[in-house]
Amino acid sequence: MRTLWIMAVLLLGVEGHLMQFETLIMKIAGRSGVWWYGSYGCYCGAGGQGRPQDPSDRCCFVHDCCYGKVTGCNTKDEFYTYSEENGAITCGGENPCLKEVCECDLAAAICFRDNLDTYNSKKYWMFPAKNCLEESEPC
């Protein structure tokens, strides 16, 4: 019950492209980003510090780094454009900044899919921040 409440609170704050990111993760990895990656390891979810704990957590680290390189738009609440053709998703639109945000999200969704076998909910779901105190590697 507590987990459901936490997820409901997280969803209340989701606007703009974060819902698009959730959709991309569902389409590509076949998993809910909120449920699977909303609080996983040291980098999946809000914030991020320390060393990525496994390849799935590294997907979130790389995603955070990707967002850090985007300038000129809000990475969390502006909508971007993408298209689907024959199962392939392509980021587009007139705004180069939002296209970059889409490409960050798309790369993360593909990374999650490619690392489903490394996902370890028993070990890294709701991972305590006190275990993420090692020095972070550079992006």
From Swiss-Prot:
Organism placement in taxonomy: Eukaryota, Metazoa, Chordata, Craniata, Vertebrata
Task of the protein: Snake venom phospholipase A2 (PLA2) that inhibits the ADP- and collagen-induced human platelet aggregation. Exhibits high hydrolytic activities and preferred the anionic micelles to the zwitterionic micelles. PLA2 catalyzes the calcium-dependent hydrolysis of the 2-acyl groups in 3-sn-phosphoglycerides.
One GO CC annotation: host extracellular space
Signal sequence annotation: 1-16
Transmembrane region(s): none
Cofactor(s) required, per the database record: Ca(2+)
Protein's UniProt name: Acidic phospholipase A2 DE-I
Primary residence: secreted
Membership in a protein family: Belongs to the phospholipase A2 family. Group II subfamily. D49 sub-subfamily.
Catalysed conversion reaction: a 1,2-diacyl-sn-glycero-3-phosphocholine + H2O = a 1-acyl-sn-glycero-3-phosphocholine + a fatty acid + H(+)
Family matches, as InterPro entries: PLipase_A2 (IPR001211), PLipase_A2_Asp_AS (IPR033112), PLipase_A2_dom (IPR016090), PLipase_A2_dom_sf (IPR036444), PLipase_A2_His_AS (IPR033113)
Domain of life: Eukaryota
Active site per database record: 63, 105
Keywords for the protein's UniProt record, in alphabetical order: Calcium, Disulfide bond, Hemostasis impairing toxin, Hydrolase, Lipid degradation, Lipid metabolism, Metal-binding, Platelet aggregation inhibiting toxin, Secreted, Signal, Toxin
